[in-house]
Amino acid sequence: EKKLSYPVELKIGTYTVVCEVTNKETGYFNLTEFSLKVTSAFSEGFYILKETTDGNTDMDFYNDRQKTVIPDVIASVQGEAQSGKPCNMCPVYNKIYIDPATAKSTYATGVFVTSGQNEFSIYSTIDMSTLFDRSSLLFSEMDGEEVPYAMVSAMRGNMLFSNKGVRLDDLGGGSFASEYSTGKLGYPAGKGTSSFIQAYDGQNLSFWSGETRRLMYTSGSDMEEIKYKDGYEGVKVDWEQAAPVASGWNHRAGKNTIWYLFDVAGEGRYVVVLQPGGGIDQVIRLDASLHLAKADVIAGNALT
């Protein structure tokens, strides 16, 4: 009987470990396997975006396994909170970056946080170090007029949405990723976007464009308007007067429902329902007495 000890130097994730034991005299052997889950202090739980008492941005982390809370994770690691009031937070999967310890390309799950007028950082869920910010995500420092809204992971890669358009980056470990990838982003495609982003189909994401004032979809390399489905004769939205309020994606009984909520000046609120990959399927003008027609904080239930 031996006590085995083996150092684990693996990325966060779930692995299958196979052990083989061989009898030196007979040559008989036996195999056994087990699952190994590699985690970090910041990889299993929930991030809570918050405004600090002095008006800046930080996050608390709730560890779901240990039922504990780590407060102020940005300030505790970075030495100070992120400047400006919090705006948005997104998970970014398989984000490529250069590991400063090895100077080689690698990848990790990140948390994209925007604050103030145009500040953002991508923090590693391994140790909350900064993977990228305004000074490092592009091949040159980001233009002062660019406003990043969100970074979203999709089938083709990670997409940065800003008022300049969409920038696409390969997923680390994916079939298109190169061992020489740096994670930096090139020129944007299309026109200005917003923070209202949802799925659309297996390849594309839908979003509200603040520049074209239309619902659009993108694969990261181009943009197209989402039009009413063929033969649509229902209620329509005056896009020029519409202001986005919320968006969501619901999955129920095997059906995906993607929706956007708009406030139209002088008319009230409308719910726009998309048919995945097929255009605008339905528009519902809300009764002014409904809570949804007046609420300030709205969230969608992703899975019922």
Predicted regions and their residues:
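Preference for solvent-exposed, low-hydrophobicity sequence contexts
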Residues: 68-69, 73-77, 96-304
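Short, flexible N-terminal segments of the mature chain
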Residues: 60-86
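Residue-level signal for short segments within beta-strands and strand-turn junctions
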Residues: 23, 61-63, 275, 287
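An edge-strand/N-cap motif at the start of beta-rich repeat modules
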Residues: 35-65
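Surface-exposed assembly/interface segments
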Residues: 83-96
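Beta-strand-enriched, solvent-exposed domains that form extended recognition/catalytic surfaces
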Residues: 1-42
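Low-complexity, repetitive regions of proteins mediating host interaction that are extracellular
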Residues: 1, 64-65, 146
